[in-house]
């Protein structure tokens, strides 16, 4: 099978979701990815659920298609191992706090001297130049700092189960790496990529913040707040439906469906919004979710069910999407969620599960020229 990134060598030295998801996408589309961890393995190896000792579902999914090695870069020997890998690599992916790898002789300025064609991508909370660059932060912190928590409601803070800034940063990194690889074809040189979760969270709010036009609209755009025509409503059985009737024609169809034709011409009546919203709430409580969806012609005018994760995975829309792939692994039957994009000639390909920590130490280090005796010695000394 042809792969879009076949022949591209990636060293993934990230510990958390933003870098690992980026490396996963690159690997799924054919890149040869080596996952580097500390000698104790990444922290997520201990997350629940555990499929086997040292193998969490997180690791199995995010590190699929990657070879795994462990290296202690606090030692000179470990630093030299990583440098040997980087001499042969096309892409280096890391997520340490700014300055840490520089302190180990592995910063961009040092590494580019041994491999000018290397694309060096850093994914951090606040970027390399921010005065907050040393501040630790996870997705929950980032979406709070960026104002994203408040966008879906009027006063109540919303917490998403989806790591929005982390996944967004991953995809930004994939795009940036792809552009840098294309640019390298013209210039012959690699470059440095600085990806920030905070900047990603801000950029994802372009419609809601509307700051590029000079008018700071916070909460008054159709997508930046709840309106009676753009909201989630509870139904008789305690379930919910999404009403996304932004287009006037869809709004009119919705009003007919709920038998409130008097609201057809009041789509933008925000003066009486609370009253209109309550009318809709009362009416939607008279039927179950599935009864309303049947009347809504299964989404014909942007009225759709709100599913829980189990329902989302089991519904026909997901099954026919091609997003799920079930494979028989040594740990048992595993269902993987594939990348969202589909390439007609060079599709993604899930080839093997995520590795145990250091599973490919001997194979990878042997390819670098280290003897079996040296590899055993490295293990005994805590270098790998």
What are these regions (language model features)?
Residues 11, 56-113, 285:
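A structured beta-alpha segment of the ubiquitous adenosine-cofactor-binding alpha/beta core
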Residues 22-25, 29, 88, 102-241, ...:
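Active-site-adjacent "lid/gating" segments in soluble enzymes
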Residues 270, 328-377:
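Flexible, small-/acidic-enriched active-site or ligand-binding loops
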């Amino acid at each position: 099978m042809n792969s879009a990134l076949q022949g591209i060598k990636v060293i993934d030295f990230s510990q958390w979701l933003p870098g690992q998801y980026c490396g996963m996408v690159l690997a799924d589309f054919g890149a040869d990815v080596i996952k580097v961890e500390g000698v104790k393995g990444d922290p997520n190896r201990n997350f629940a659920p555990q499929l086997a000792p040292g193998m969490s579902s997180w690791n199995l999914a995010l590190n699929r298609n990657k070879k795994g090695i462990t290296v202690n870069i606090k030692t000179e020997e470990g630093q030299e191992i990583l440098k040997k890998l980087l001499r042969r690599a096309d892409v280096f992916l890391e997520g340490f706090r700014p300055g840490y790898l520089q302190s180990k002789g592995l910063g961009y300025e040092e590494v580019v001297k041994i491999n000018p064609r290397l694309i060096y991508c850093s994914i951090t909370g606040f970027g390399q130049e921010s005065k907050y660059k040393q501040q630790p932060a996870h997705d929950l912190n980032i979406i709070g700092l960026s104002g994203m928590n408040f966008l879906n409601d009027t006063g109540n803070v919303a917490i998403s189960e989806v790591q929005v800034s982390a996944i967004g940063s991953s995809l930004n990194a994939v795009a940036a790496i792809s552009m840098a690889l294309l640019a390298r074809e013209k210039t012959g040189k690699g470059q440095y990529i600085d990806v920030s979760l905070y900047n990603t969270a801000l950029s994802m709010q372009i419609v809601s913040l509307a700051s590029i036009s000079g008018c700071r609209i916070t909460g008054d755009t159709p997508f930046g707040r709840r309106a009676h025509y753009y909201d989630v409503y509870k139904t008789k059985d305690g379930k919910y439906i999404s009403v996304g009737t932004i287009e006037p024609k869809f709004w009119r169809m919705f009003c007919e469906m709920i038998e409130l034709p008097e609201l057809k011409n009041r789509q933008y009546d925000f003066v009486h919004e609370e009253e209109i919203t309550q009318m809709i709430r009362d009416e939607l409580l008279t039927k179950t979710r599935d009864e309303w969806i049947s009347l809504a012609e299964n989404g014909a005018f942007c009225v759709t069910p709100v599913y829980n994760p189990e329902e989302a995975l089991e519904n026909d829309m997901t099954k026919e999407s091609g997003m799920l792939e079930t494979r028989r692994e040594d740990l048992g039957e595993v269902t993987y969620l594939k990348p969202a994009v589909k390439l007609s000639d060079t599709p993604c390909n899930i080839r093997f599960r995520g590795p145990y920590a250091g599973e490919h130490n001997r194979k990878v280090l042997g390819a670098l020229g280290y003897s079996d005796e040296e590899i055993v010695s490295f293990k005994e000394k805590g270098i790998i």
